Amino acid sequence: MRYRLLLLAICLVLGIDSLSSVSIGAPSKQYVSPGTPVTYSDSGSTHVMALQNLATLTGVYGARHDKGAGSQPGQWMWACSFTLSGTNIVGAQIEIYVSWSDGTYADGALGTSNGSLTTADKRRDLKLVGTVVVDQTTSNTTMTASGMAWIPTRYFSPAVWNGTTLSLQNVANTSSCAFTPIPPEQQ
């Protein structure tokens, strides 16, 4: 209340006829500043995730990524590309998950290095961040999807579940995922 009275008194002294014309703070824009992608594939990437020839109704997870100590962005963009072998069935899905970890405990009790999801139930304790949906019947076509994931922990591992009726292509590095930090930037 005192603040309003003081502001009113200042307005009267300065001859300002309306409190609405007083700007308390300058407007600013909020941008994003994408960082360096953390990549996952069979080889030659930041971390290994064995996607080559991933069979139908099976899953894998990638090696655990360490974002580093201190303040780190929690918002990440994921983008995954997959190539199936055979004639695709439109509408089938490949699921993308994330396992958070504090360095001691990991969602789904996933290990620190590349591994397999031993059962379909292993997905229950992971965070589903999105899907890549088969959108055409043409075989050997790469399909890509992307989305946003909230990853507030220092460590994380991505996981992929092949829910289609086909294996991923039996060629190294034709399927991959990338996770890019998207920290906000105040202007």
Regions found by a protein language model. Give the residues of each.
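Bacterial N-terminal signal peptides that target proteins for export
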Residues: 1-7
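Bacterial N-terminal signal peptides
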Residues: 8-17
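Terminal beta-strand-rich extracellular "head" domains
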Residues: 95-142
